[in-house]
Amino acid sequence: AIAKRLTMYRLRSKVEITLPEDLAVQLHLAAPAPQPGVQVTLALGNERWMTIEIAQVANADSTETDADRAADFMQRWALAGITALQAEITADTTERFVPQMIGWDTVTPGGGISFGKGCYPGQEVVARAHYRGAVKRHIEVACFPAADLVAGSEVTLPDGRTAEICNIAVRHATETVALLVVGNQSG
């Protein structure tokens, strides 16, 4: 989806945008290599932290446990983002929300979007919503009993309002936490 979206910006350039099939992430520490099992914590700002547990050192074999740790890390990362009201747009939620609905205009420093002269898809809608103050939805966190919730789907809240799911994370085996885009209450 990223490569497809980036092709909109190549204009008349004769450039082909693709992503490698074997994309991987590596962490290089400017210190002696820690042993497997050691945790490294990084502060990312806005009350959000990332803890990396060293699962393997270069050339060590991967195990099923590594996959389980990666899945657990991704759930904890998603939960931290939801708790901090930091929406992440995925393939299921692409082009579903105006940036102000998910709080990107309040990201610090300097805001997460520019309202100045620009040329990107949807810029007119984003600027109009900003200058008219006409954003009719906002983000909230909600907890649900463990359920098969899907980002991009609609749910009905206990107070009768409907909301669209932006992000989800499993907190416990019995509870799912979601970042919702909810209509503003009138009145």
Q: Language-model segments: which ranges?
A:
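Basic, glycine/lysine-rich polyanion-binding surfaces/domains
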Residues: 1-187
